[in-house]
């Protein structure tokens, strides 16, 4: 069940909720009670799926923008489109960066960037980030 909760947290933070999944991931790693590889997989997949959700919302922007509950505003759309247009597909490698990651993944959907290359680039960035966190924690526990 802890893996599912980690997936949900990682998914949620990759959408529009402004908090980090890193603290939860690090806490679970630090406890030493769970399979580290499964923690890495669940946090990574959850976070990538959250970005996929953003892409889908961007792809169907004309439907969602009319909904009162939709949290993305025109300013966020413009910011994401500007970054994505300036740096192209490579900006997706930075989809994990706070404040710019969500607008970039959303912009990729609004600009109809193909889903397979989207998933590959986002996965490289997000899995790479969590892998770096994982390796840092493992290293820290060896020396401290």
List each model region and its residues:
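Membrane-interfacial helix-loop-helix
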Residues: 1-5, 31-103, 110-144
């Amino acid at each position: 069940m802890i893996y599912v909760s980690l997936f949900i947290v990682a998914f949620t933070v990759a959408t529009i909720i402004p908090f980090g999944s890193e603290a939860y991931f690090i806490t679970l790693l630090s406890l030493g009670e769970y399979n580290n590889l499964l923690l890495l997989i669940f946090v990574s997949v959850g976070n990538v799926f959250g970005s996929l959700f953003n892409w889908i919302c961007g792809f169907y922007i004309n439907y969602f923008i009319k909904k009162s509950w939709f949290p993305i505003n025109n300013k966020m759309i413009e910011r994401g489109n500007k970054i994505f247009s300036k740096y192209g597909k490579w900006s997706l490698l930075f989809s994990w960066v706070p404040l710019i990651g969500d607008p970039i993944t959303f912009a990729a959907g609004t600009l109809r960037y193909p889903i397979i290359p989207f998933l590959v680039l986002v996965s490289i960035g997000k899995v790479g980030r969590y892998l770096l966190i994982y390796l840092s924690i493992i290293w820290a526990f060896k020396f401290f």
